[in-house]
Amino acid sequence: MTTAALQTQLQGYLDYLIIERSIAANTLSSYRRDLIRYSKHLSDRGIEDLAKVGEHDVSEFLVALRRGDPDSGVAALSAVSAARALIAVRGLHRFAVAEGLVDLDVARAVRPPTPGRRLPKSLTVDEVLALLESVGGESRADGPLVLRNRALLELLYSTGSRISEAVGLDVDDVDTQARTVLLQGKGGKQRLVPVGRPAVQALDAYLVRGRSDLARRGPGMLATPAIFLNARGGRLSRQSAWQVLQDAAEHAGITSGVSPHMLRHSFATHLLEGGADIRVVQELMGHASVTTTQIYTLVTVQALREVWAGAHPRAK
């Protein structure tokens, strides 16, 4: 059990992130989860205060994250997830130094694990088309949920948006005449991205024939400006949007474990395969660095290599 002192110090840092840093709710949730795990790690080692933490305690926390605890049902974290947890821990210790709670930043020298370079998985163009067509949305007899689902999936693929960006859209963020969408990215950064005609048509159909029906099911005085609504008239959650995608993949016969991020990967990969400049793809994806976008060029190079290996007489 986490001690009262550790709980107070942890909550003080979280309050600082909310009030002073105004970090996004999703980021705050991740920090809280990682820091609760860290405080439990310290408590299990008999440490009741951040002033008693040493560099080796932080290093051992990383080891514990990577190893997991099968006996307690705690899964091992990937190098990427463990590195993310270390960011939260480092922030906590920097805060403790700044607030005079401790004298030294014992987490500063701890290095994150090096993640392996994994190529992002993407769908083929035919698989994406099958996915989109599996939800309907083209008949006037389609209900509001079908219209919503088609519009959501079309928008995800057309814009390459993150699932949180899509469900966070308000009606005023979409201009179907100009065929643009204003996305709220990580760190509150906005970007205006173009939307393809099929996605605009799906959005128009949903906004005209579907959304108003769903909105009437919600409390009138608390009507949400969200574009994508759930069956009760409230904003669609990330989890529900994920389920929409999984159901569509199942109906399309795609068994490769489709996720919202896979649709985003497909967006980037298909653009690069079509000859798009990597800097343009970076802007569309909302990546802070082009290095993040370059991983998708490896996917297209890998596809070219496979074709070459099967066709060139001197490949083998």
From Swiss-Prot:
Residues 118-309 form the Tyr recombinase domain. It holds the Pfam family Phage_int_SAM_1. GO terms for biological process: cell division; chromosome segregation; DNA transposition. Keywords: Cell cycle, Cell division, Chromosome partition, Cytoplasm, DNA integration, DNA recombination, DNA-binding. The active site is at R162, K186, H261, R264, H287, Y296 (o-(3'-phospho-dna)-tyrosine intermediate). It is found in: Cytoplasm. Residues 4-97 form the Core-binding (CB) domain. It comes from the Bacteria. Belongs to the 'phage' integrase family. XerD subfamily. Forms a cyclic heterotetrameric complex composed of two molecules of XerC and two molecules of XerD. This is Tyrosine recombinase XerD. It comes from Mycobacterium leprae (strain TN).
